Design a protein with these regions (language model features):
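Mixed-charge (acidic/basic) macromolecular-recognition segments
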Residues: 86-135
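Conserved aromatic-histidine-acidic binding/catalytic patches
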Residues: 48, 70-74, 111
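Compact, glycine/acidic-enriched structural inserts
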Residues: 64-101
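A surface-exposed partner-binding patch
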Residues: 1-68, 116-150
Length: 150
């Protein structure tokens, strides 16, 4: 974890964010950035995918994402839950890498789906609000099932 501070949002204080990039799912910013979307005061702490931004709502402390800079969608109930979910994801994929790949393609598809189901169950267990259709973790779960993280 890395601690970031923001002079522009002293109410936020110091926040601990995951220190390193996690595939295309998460990349930390070098410095916190303040933004305003939908009348919400947000602090960007990371990136996701090619164009997405991960942000903390200063009022609710929820983690949100935006891909267009004009609307946001829910990711996690808090930065702590986000970090736990991200660590679960990393640990899950690390276990697969250590075990090695499947013998044939059909077996790989079954293993990818089983891995995706474990990811979904883990995310739901950490933050019950985080996994829902068309959400950040939903999209990652489906990418895992398709073998994008194999």
């Amino acid at each position: 974890m890395t601690t970031l501070t923001s002079r522009d949002a002293p109410s936020l204080g110091e926040i601990k964010v995951p220190a390193g990039a996690v595939y295309a799912a998460y990349k930390p910013v070098h410095a916190l950035e303040i933004d305003q979307i939908d009348d919400r005061s947000l602090v960007q702490f990371g990136f996701t995918g090619a164009f997405g931004k991960l942000m903390i709502d200063l009022e609710s402390r929820e983690v949100l994402e935006t891909h267009d800079g004009s609307t946001v969608s829910f990711v996690n109930s808090s930065l702590e839950r986000f970090a736990e979910c991200l660590q679960f994801f990393v640990d899950l994929l690390s276990g697969v890498e250590e075990a090695g790949g499947p013998e044939d393609e059909g077996e790989g598809e079954d293993e990818n789906e089983a891995l995706a189901q474990r990811l979904e169950a883990g995310i739901r267990g950490i933050d019950s609000r985080a996994y829902r259709e068309d959400s950040y973790w939903y999209e990652i779960r489906w990418a895992v099932s398709l073998g994008d993280y194999a």
